[in-house]
């Protein structure tokens, strides 16, 4: 469960390393975001000499959370970290590589470009 002020790792090579959630896109008063939700975040740490800079406001989609994800078949998936992928206004990833495993629920949410770049889909 991601809420405002939560720090997340970045799971792509866009140039950002750490994000802080400042808003959850969707309903106006949602408290928590889950896997597949789009958030507005600020970059807290970035790689030098990249297009993304520290304190820049961006959009990101959540790909991993420490909170369990329950599937309809009874399977429960839990990750070791909270991670997101930086996206543009159309929902395409800004990076060209994705690091780590991502859930297959992203394919159902029309993030097919992120799923195709991922090395492992659970």
Curated annotation (Swiss-Prot):
<dbReference type="GO" id="GO:0022625">
    <property type="term" value="C:cytosolic large ribosomal subunit"/>
</dbReference>
<dbReference type="GO" id="GO:0003735">
    <property type="term" value="F:structural constituent of ribosome"/>
</dbReference>
<keyword id="KW-0934">Plastid</keyword>
<dbReference type="Pfam" id="PF00238">
    <property type="entry name" value="Ribosomal_L14"/>
</dbReference>
<dbReference type="GO" id="GO:0070180">
    <property type="term" value="F:large ribosomal subunit rRNA binding"/>
</dbReference>
<comment type="subunit">
    <text>Part of the 50S ribosomal subunit.</text>
</comment>
<keyword id="KW-0687">Ribonucleoprotein</keyword>
<dbReference type="GO" id="GO:0009507">
    <property type="term" value="C:chloroplast"/>
</dbReference>
<keyword id="KW-0150">Chloroplast</keyword>
<dbReference type="InterPro" id="IPR019972">
    <property type="entry name" value="Ribosomal_uL14_CS"/>
</dbReference>
<dbReference type="InterPro" id="IPR000218">
    <property type="entry name" value="Ribosomal_uL14"/>
</dbReference>
<dbReference type="InterPro" id="IPR005745">
    <property type="entry name" value="Ribosomal_uL14_bac-type"/>
</dbReference>
<comment type="function">
    <text>Binds to 23S rRNA.</text>
</comment>
<dbReference type="GO" id="GO:0006412">
    <property type="term" value="P:translation"/>
</dbReference>
<keyword id="KW-0694">RNA-binding</keyword>
<dbReference type="InterPro" id="IPR036853">
    <property type="entry name" value="Ribosomal_uL14_sf"/>
</dbReference>
<protein>
    <recommendedName>
        <fullName>Large ribosomal subunit protein uL14c</fullName>
    </recommendedName>
</protein>
<keyword id="KW-0689">Ribosomal protein</keyword>
<keyword id="KW-0699">rRNA-binding</keyword>
<comment type="similarity">
    <text>Belongs to the universal ribosomal protein uL14 family.</text>
</comment>
């Amino acid at each position: 469960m991601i809420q405002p002020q939560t720090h997340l790792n970045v799971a792509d090579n866009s140039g950002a390393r750490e994000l802080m959630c400042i808003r959850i896109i969707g309903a106006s008063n949602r408290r928590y975001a889950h896997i597949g939700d789009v958030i507005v975040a600020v970059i807290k740490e970035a790689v030098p000499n990249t297009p993304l800079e520290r304190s820049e406001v961006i959009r990101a989609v959540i790909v991993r959370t420490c909170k369990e994800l329950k599937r309809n078949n009874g399977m429960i998936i839990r990750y070791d970290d909270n991670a997101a992928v930086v996206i543009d206004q159309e929902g395409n990833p800004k990076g060209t590589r994705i690091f780590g495993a991502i859930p297959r629920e992203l394919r159902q949410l029309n993030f097919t470009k992120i799923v195709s770049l991922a090395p492992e889909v659970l």
